[in-house]
């Protein structure tokens, strides 16, 4: 009796363009079908005939092979607020956009990830629902310092705290004393302490959070549906004041990496440069929306654009891009993330003329109050084409093989959205590059295709995003997670069940 044929032990992907170790090159990538890891990389396109008969082989030329993106700032909201998002839909949206790893924020789920018990509930909720790999952050809140070391042992990738009201009562803001306690606990742990860096400067203390939450606002005066009114209520001094507070405490834990999430105000950049020159271990991220949306373009009532810190002026956006494009070792903004923070459409209070609005028959027409609407941008899985569209406009990118700007742009995106985000969460030896020993997380990117963002291409749960209707350049053709094709733009989700893993090993 003839023995059944053996399953090939490897699969192979190749392209005339791939970003390997930060460099655009031709490449052939050999993947172990047993481990899902890359076993070899060659800097040329090797023909299929050079491999054993039956080896799965695809040459994706002229599309670009990129490392799967690592989105290090996503709110998946499960358990507790699954009507806002969930592991299943949120990770499908990620895979659609070439994101192969997401790190889930500690708030907007109930319970928040501020205790080991809360983390275990989240893990239980996530099991069997993730289409890509998922890691978790812990939170710092008043009174939970005693939980932090245990959360490190349980594998959280870092910790986040707010210096201003978070918008949800179960995740209160921390005081300077709370931060000191957290720093004491985490000073010698392999982790990162991150902050939502907005706080009320002393001059605003008399009106408190009413500046940003009351309706009508306590200050400044103006129509609540006007974006200019909202923007004036969250000035850049909120960010600079918070960063100064954090830096004043940094000496308490000099070996603990600090990180500013979703930096919006360009005025923060000189403060961070000075701190890094003085030896403070601090970095920052910015978001796709701060790099692509501008205050001048936001219509009255279009609360799809509401987030905190707010989207600022075009001039400010240019300042963020200028910093981002500095030499890799000089810039303080190291990473770009989505900060996907969705909600149900009704919480956006959109007027009926704005796409994504929610108004049942007989309801009073919403005015689009920027002060009452939920703050958060929905964009997980859209980041790569958003970045490519912006860079195409700014750098006049072409598809010519020798276009130096295109080469630089591809390499920059991999640094900002793959390699550096992986390093931020301690996955630099596993994710964010296409080299032997790493997970075969691959994004097949068509850098010339253009497409329109529609509800059918927003795979997150609620189809309410400021990007709806926009034409984007750059399309993810396929997404591979640990050596298996998960998503194809032509065929959808190839596997019938989610196979993403939870990243629970302790950071080292």
Label each residue range with its predicted role:
Residues 50-51, 55-129:
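Metal-associated gating/positioning segment near the N- to mid-region
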Residues 146-161, 165-336, 352-362, 397:
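Histidine/acidic residue-rich metal-binding segments in metalloenzymes
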Residues 2-67:
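Histidine-rich, glycine-flanked metal-binding segment
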């Amino acid at each position: 009796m003839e023995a059944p044929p053996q399953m090939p032990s490897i699969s192979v992907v190749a392209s005339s363009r791939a970003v390997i170790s930060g460099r655009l090159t031709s490449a052939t990538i050999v993947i172990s079908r047993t481990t899902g890891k890359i076993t070899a990389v060659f800097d040329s396109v090797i023909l299929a005939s050079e491999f054993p008969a039956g080896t799965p082989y695809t040459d994706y030329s002229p599309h670009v092979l990129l490392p799967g993106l690592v989105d290090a700032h996503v709110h998946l909201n499960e358990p507790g607020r699954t009507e806002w998002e969930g592991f299943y839909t949120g990770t499908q949206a990620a895979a659609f956009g070439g994101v192969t790893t997401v790190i889930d924020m500690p708030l907007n789920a109930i319970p928040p990830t501020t205790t080991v018990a809360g983390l275990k509930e989240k893990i239980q909720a996530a099991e069997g629902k993730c289409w890509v790999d998922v890691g978790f952050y812990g939170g710092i809140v008043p009174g939970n310092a005693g939980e932090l070391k245990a959360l490190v042992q349980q594998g959280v990738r870092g910790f986040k705290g707010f210096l201003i009201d978070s918008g949800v009562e179960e995740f209160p803001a921390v005081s300077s004393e709370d931060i000191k306690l957290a720093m004491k606990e985490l000073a010698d742990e392999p982790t990162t302490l991150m902050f939502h860096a907005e706080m009320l400067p002393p001059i605003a203390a008399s009106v408190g959070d009413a500046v940003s939450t009351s309706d009508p606002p306590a200050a400044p005066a103006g129509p609540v549906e006007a974006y200019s009114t909202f923007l004036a209520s969250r000035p850049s001094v909120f960010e600079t004041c918070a960063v100064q507070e954090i830096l004043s405490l940094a000496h308490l834990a000099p070996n603990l990496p600090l990180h500013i999430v979703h930096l919006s105000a360009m005025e923060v950049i000189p403060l961070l440069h000075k701190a890094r020159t003085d030896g403070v271990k601090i970095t920052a991220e910015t978001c796709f929306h701060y790099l692509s949306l501008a205050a001048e373009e936001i219509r009255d009532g279009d609360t799809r654009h509401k987030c905190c810190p707010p989207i600022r002026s075009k001039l400010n956006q240019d300042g963020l891009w200028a910093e981002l494009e500095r030499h890799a070792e000089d810039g303080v903004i190291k990473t770009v993330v989505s900060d996907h923070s969705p909600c149900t459409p009704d919480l956006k209070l959109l007027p009926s003329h704005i796409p994504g609005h929610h108004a049942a028959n007989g309801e009073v027409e919403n005015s689009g109050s920027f002060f009452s609407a939920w703050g958060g941008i929905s964009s997980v899985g859209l980041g790569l084409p958003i970045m490519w569209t912006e860079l195409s406009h700014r750098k006049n990118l072409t598809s010519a093989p020798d276009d130096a700007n295109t080469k630089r742009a591809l390499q920059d995106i991999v640094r900002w959205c793959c390699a550096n985000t992986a390093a931020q969460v301690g996955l630099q030896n596993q994710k964010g590059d296409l080299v032997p020993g790493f997970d075969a997380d691959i994004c097949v990117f068509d850098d010339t295709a253009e497409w329109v963002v529609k509800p059918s291409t927003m795979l997150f749960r609620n189809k309410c995003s400021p990007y709806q209707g926009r034409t984007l350049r750059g399309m993810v053709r396929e997404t591979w997670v640990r050596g298996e094709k998960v998503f194809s733009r032509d065929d959808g989700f190839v596997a019938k069940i989610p196979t993403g893993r939870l990243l629970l090993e302790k950071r080292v």
